[in-house]
Regions:
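Short, composition-biased local secondary-structure segments
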Residues: 95-109, 125, 171-181
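Acidic/glycine-enriched edge-of-secondary-structure segments
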Residues: 84-97, 133-142, 163-167
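Nucleotide 5′-phosphate-binding alpha/beta core
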Residues: 5, 9-108, 112-113, 252, ...
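Hydrophobic/aromatic beta-strand patches that form the interior of the parallel beta-sheet core
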Residues: 48, 54, 117-118, 144, ...
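Active-site glycine/GP-rich loop and adjacent strand/helix microenvironment
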Residues: 9-25, 139-408
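Short secondary-structure boundary/capping elements
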Residues: 77, 97-101, 124-128, 146-150
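Conserved AMP-binding loop of ANL adenylate-forming enzymes
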Residues: 107-143
Length: 408
């Protein structure tokens, strides 16, 4: 069902245990998983016997055996789509109904068969666009596959087709609304939104309230699909019923007590074709005690609370320290120290790459253009470059310094 069933304690559900055992049996036939799955799993608590599988592990495994590192249980012909996400990581999906499970999030946000949905997630390379397209189809919504570019045209289309619902990152909707207002385009039919892929800053949330837009957030990844979703504002996020979610001490297998902040670890139970067991998201969150006031009885988490490592999300894209190193290595033979500064001004995320480099101004101008191009190529994001004196960057181990204020 789209509405969560009665679930009880997260580590005691018997139907989860049955699904987990089936998932593990499939995964044991895959060589790279078999070593992780030697211990017998008789309870959900026994999951801690299985080592956490990290995104960095997945990148290296796939690199050695493209495209999926031989981690798929079934042949590629049985899958529907292949995607390539930053990392790079290859993802895929199957033909099963609600494969990514985002229909639950849309349903909780009030979307239905009366809605015209402007889907502003990308439809190319990465799975986000298809994730929400699939979800909206299940709810019988009418979908405009907009993607995440050209805000002027987005505003025009939103007015002409009488869009009632938006899915995408929060900042982009604000830009579209402002474009519509500046061009006297009526968009009064827009009443609801479901956000993911980027933080909802307090000032932006207040802006949407002032426009009488009912908005909700959901939390998911390209590797895992839906992890959790809001069913009511300020009530945390309901964990999707087809996953097992654990909160552990970052970098370990050890669970933390409910209420303590730690790293989100996910096992996906409904997709046997590509077994995902104890996958470390690199995200921080915490389990909220008690039941949701909406009546949904699955456990809740506070939502996305930052990164367990220095990886950060900017304009819907993950940026990793290894990518910063690659930019520098591709252009500099002496591998100077570099630090990426992520800031926010005028409701927009900004990137500035600081590089310790001494040369004449003409060399710096030419090199600046090359670095900007390399940032766009590797990060899929625009940014600026600033060359600084040797030894001026602090010796704090930070490659990415996120200065944005995420609020409480």
């Amino acid at each position: 069902t789209l509405r969560s069933r009665g679930l009880g304690d997260v580590y005691k559900r018997q139907d989860h245990l049955v699904s987990l055992k089936k998932l593990i049996e499939n995964a044991k036939t895959i060589t790279l998983h078999s070593d992780r799955l030697k211990n017998e799993i008789s309870t959900l608590t026994d999951l801690q016997k299985i080592d956490v599988f990290r995104k960095s592990d997945l990148i290296e495994i796939q690199k050695k055996n493209l495209p999926f590192g031989n981690l798929n249980f079934t042949e590629l012909s049985e899958f529907s789509h292949i995607y390539r996400s930053p990392g790079p990581i290859y993802d895929l999906d199957g033909y099963g109904n609600n494969w990514w499970r985002f229909a639950r999030a849309l349903n909780a946000a009030g979307f239905n068969n009366k809605d015209i949905v402007q889907n502003c997630f990308s439809y190319h390379f990465t799975p986000a666009g298809m994730m929400f397209d699939e979800a909206a189809k299940i709810l019988k919504c009418t979908i405009f596959p907009a993607g995440g570019e050209n805000s002027d045209m987005q505003a025009e289309i939103m007015s002409e087709i009488n869009t009632t619902g938006y899915v995408g990152i929060p900042d982009f909707l604000k830009i579209i609304i402002e474009k519509a207002e500046n061009n006297d385009l009526p968009i009064s039919n827009l009443k609801k939104a479901l956000f993911s892929g980027g933080p909802l800053f307090p000032d932006v949330a207040e802006y949407f309230k002032s426009k009488n837009i009912n908005f909700y957030q959901c939390y998911g990844t390209a590797d895992l699909g839906l992890i959790a979703y809001e069913a009511d504002i300020n009530d945390g996020m309901i964990v999707d019923e087809d996953i097992i979610l654990e909160i552990v001490k970052p970098g370990t297998n050890e669970r933390v007590p409910n209420g303590e902040v730690g790293e989100v670890i996910v096992t996906v139970l409904n997709n046997y074709e590509l077994p995902i067991i104890r996958f470390a998201t690199g995200d921080l969150s915490t389990i909220i005690e008690g039941q949701s006031k909406t009546g949904r009885t699955n456990i809740r988490i506070k939502g996305w609370m930052g990164r367990a490592d220095q990886t950060t999300k900017v304009r819907g894209m993950f940026v990793q320290p290894s990518q910063i190193a690659k930019i520098v290595d591709n252009l500099f033979t002496n591998k100077p120290k570099a630090k990426l500064i992520v800031s926010r001004e005028n409701n927009r995320d900004n990137l500035k790459l600081l590089i310790e480099y001494v040369s004449n101004e003409n060399d710096k101008i030419a090199l600046n253009e090359k670095v900007v191009d390399e940032m766009k190529k590797i990060l899929n994001l625009n940014g600026i470059v600033e060359f600084v004196n040797l030894g001026s960057l602090p010796n704090d181990g930070k490659v990415i310094d996120d200065l944005r204020d995420f609020g409480d």
